[in-house]
Amino acid sequence: MAATLASIHVYPLKSCAPMALDSARVEARGLEHDRRWMAVDASGKFLTGRQHPRLTLIRAEPDDAGALRLRAPDMPELRLMPAPDRARSTADVWGSRVDALVADAAADAWISAFLGIPARFVHMDADCLRNVDPDYAQPGDSVSFADGYPLLAIAQAALDLLNS
């Protein structure tokens, strides 16, 4: 059976609006730029679009300097980068505790104002390791802040059914 890849989408910020691509670079943790940033609550637990639908209104686009440009309704554009001191904090995504880089206070204020709750951004750099569930992976397999696996695919028929 042959399959056709009809579209490629990444979510540079977990749960944000998708970014369509013509092509993508596949890395060990998934597609380049996919879910390398995430919003977390005051305790470090990840926030999703299921809990906070406003996250899905954020448009995120990587720039050539390694920053992430964020746009959201009624908010100024934000250029998101790790804090200059490269401080780290523990983040929790689906029970995985990861040591991630934090953004600066201005970025934390931006996401807190947009969501209406205390929140902050964390970033998965090369030193941040999150292993794939060992029941479904090879030793050493790692993943971004995606729900569980480096690459996620869906059949068009299933997507059509979900959207009907």
Q: What are the language-model segments listed below?
A:
Residues 1-164:
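Small-residue-enriched flexible connectors and coil-helix boundary/helix-cap motifs
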